[in-house]
Structure formats: C-alpha cells, structure tokens
C-alpha cells in the first residue's frame, strides 16, 4: 500500500511541474486533463502527508519515553502517544478507502428515469413522490434539475418521468437509487382504510459525452410529431416532438418537453447515449458474472431495494438493513443518512474484495 502511495505522491509532484509548463498552459486539452488528474489525487496526497507527519511525531514521542522524565511529563507523553496512535490508525483506514478503484462515472451528471410499475394510479402518484424527493435532494446539494420527458396522469402522478441532474458528483450519490421502490399506504380513494402496496422503478444513468459513446448517424431513425399532453390531446401544432430509435439495439427515446424540435433532439440524444452505455455495461457485467458464477446483486433493477411505509412513517433500505422512522423527511429530500450509509457499505465491500485479492 505504501509503495502505491509513494508513487501517487510522485505523480502529484510531477503534475505540479507539468501545470507550470508553458507548453501545457497553452494546450487547453492537456491543461484540463492534468488539472483533473491533480484534483483527483489531492485528497490522497494530503492524507498521506498527514499520515507521515503523525508517524514522525509518534516516533519522537516514543523516543522521549526512553529518556528520564518527571512522572507528570511522562504521563503527558503517554497520552500524546495514545492520541497519535489512534490518529494513525484512522488515517490508514482512510488511505485504504482512497486507494480503492474509482468509478470513472462518479463525477458525471445523471439522467434519472422513474416509471410507475405495479399499482395503477397509486404507483403513478408514488412515482411523482419520488421525483419530488430527488429534485429536493438535488437542490440541497446545489445541483440543478431539468425535465427531459414526462407522462403525467390526471391526478398529479407520472406514468414515467425522465430528468437530468446537473452537478459535481451527482452520479456518485444517486447511482445507489437504481432498483424497485415500494410504497405501502392507504390511498385517498380507499374508503375501507386498507393499506395498498405499489411500486415504481428508478434508473440512474451517467450522462455520457459523444466521444465516450459513438453513435453513427446511419444507425438512428428520427421521427417527428406534434407533442401531446395528458390524455393524448395535442398541445403543439408544430412537429416539435422527437422520437429517436437506435436500430442496432432497438432502444427508443422520445422527447417533447421543449417547444423547439432541435432542443428536443439534443435532450433525446443525451438519454440515448446514456441508455446505450448502460445496456453495454449491463451486458458486460452479466458476462463477467456468468464467468465467475456470481449472482447479480445491486444494480439489478428488478430487485426491490427500498420500502416506504406511510402508516409507520418508516423507510427501510433492504440492501443494508437500514430502517429509519423519518419517511416525511426523506420524501422532503433529506436522503443524506441513507445515501451515506450506502456509500459506506459499498466501500466496506470493496475493501473486503481488495483484502481477499491480496
């Protein structure tokens, strides 16, 4: 581990030199790439330097104990050693996490797709609840959201809603939302007071750049039509709505949220790139799992990941066994407690895998 940390520190120092090189300063691509690489290494290098400083202080303190000291001073040195050893242990654990392989998509924007599943209108209302939950969470993180496509229902729910979340690190936190979300509550239309169970599915896709997912123009069929509102009524006499079909994969994306056909096509292309990338990633994962004879775990969107129980004001994340009695706050966008627990669980599993591999 420490050989790797030395190599990281050397690379960081080399990047500092490169970023002061006039040839790099005058090359926008190199400047951007080196700056990003340096930023990615900064926390690891700072933590490693703090670790080395603590080790040095610890060695000095232990050396002092070899000398003749007054009892009171000796006790103070022992206390300092205890504190430094505790800090050293914490820094080692932090460095282990920092050295884990990074998800290359973590810093990207996100395309989120929420669809009503089992439960009819109640599922559509729940899809609307989830959409509002995520937009409020995004706002609390300083991220911006933008609707790409929506199919609203008459009672204020959504059969489907697709929206963009723009912000640094959005995917690193929202990627854990992939899966089936279940709600248990008494519908307003239920006279007998019986609890109904409904579900909605959430897909969280990283936004992909054109250079990352190559799509040939000949592989796309573009259809245009008049946009429509709830119930199918036309809301636009111009042919502004766009449907893109990726012929090789059969993936279809529609967008009619904008009045401009050009803007709708741009939004649809973003979703198409993300879905194609996700399809290839899922195929690669499935092949890997089959080779290793591993069962597909998190990331399988048919898997029920979380239950929202209204009568008990309870949210349970089934993947990590976390239950909190704060449903009202969670639906108001206060997702930090759940997401941070999921991140810690993910890191723990990666550390176990790294230890097993070594």
UniProtKB/Swiss-Prot annotation:
The modification N5-methylglutamine is found at residue 233. SMART domains: PCRF. The keyword Cytoplasm applies. PROSITE patterns: RF_PROK_I. HAMAP family: Rel_fac_1. Methylated by PrmC. Methylation increases the termination efficiency of RF1. Coiled coil: none annotated. One of its GO terms (cellular component) is cytoplasm. The keyword Transferase does not apply. GO terms for molecular function: translation release factor activity, codon specific. InterPro entries: PCRF, Pep_chain_release_fac_I, Pep_chain_release_fac_I_sf, Prokaryotic/Mito_RF, RF-1. Peptide chain release factor 1 directs the termination of translation in response to the peptide chain termination codons UAG and UAA. It is found in: Cytoplasm. Gene3D superfamilies: 3.30.160.20, 3.30.70.1660, 6.10.140.1950. This is Peptide chain release factor 1. Belongs to the prokaryotic/mitochondrial release factor family. It comes from Geobacillus thermodenitrificans (strain NG80-2). Keywords: Cytoplasm, Methylation, Protein biosynthesis.
